[in-house]
Design a protein with these regions (language model features):
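Well-ordered secondary-structure scaffolds
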Residues: 1-167
Length: 167
């Protein structure tokens, strides 16, 4: 998104969120102006400045994940993605090392889940739905556990991108 690329719905959401945050800070900007900052690379440049100011390494931003396992998860049937329950997938990611159950748990910064589909997207059997990244060994049972939380229906699912803006 910060490189001016990515899904249009996510870009639009990010621009709307940025507009609200700017307004809260007393700065008025149109959605078009905000989008221009993304496409021109200004937002990415500012993010890089913030990473450097906090002692971060810019190379880490652009280095691909170096994990033992990159497991693709495919749609098991044709239809429409009806649900990708955040709680279940969040707990799953935590067990991969991408989160903590307790404060003292270690984090594996390379672990996580990248979703290729979102709720409402059409899929055909065999389409990539997500990729699991982890340094743990993953068995078929674990993949099946993940897949049971990818709900696919044979009818179009109506989705609201933003449920409500609370001011």
């Amino acid at each position: 998104i910060l490189q001016g690329k990515g899904r249009e719905d996510v870009t639009h959401f990010i621009c709307e969120l940025a507009q609200i945050m700017l307004e809260l800070g007393g700065v008025m900007a149109s959605l078009e102006e905000i989008k221009q900052h993304l496409t021109a690379g200004k937002a990415l440049k500012k993010f890089e400045e913030m990473v450097l100011a906090q002692g971060g390494d810019l190379e880490d931003l652009y280095r691909p994940a170096q994990v033992k396992e990159q497991v693709p998860v495919y749609a098991e049937e044709d239809g429409y993605i009806a649900a990708l329950p955040a709680m279940e997938h969040g707990l799953f990611a935590m067990r991969l090392g991408a989160g903590r159950a307790v404060k003292s748990d270690d984090l594996d910064y390379e672990s996580g889940i990248v979703f290729a589909k979102k709720v409402g997207d059409p899929v055909q059997k065999g389409d990539l739905v997500a990729t699991i990244y982890t340094n743990l060994e993953i068995c078929q049972k674990t993949i099946a556990e993940f897949q049971k939380n990818v709900k696919i229906l044979d009818k179009v699912v109506s989705v609201s991108e933003i449920i409500e803006i609370v001011s």
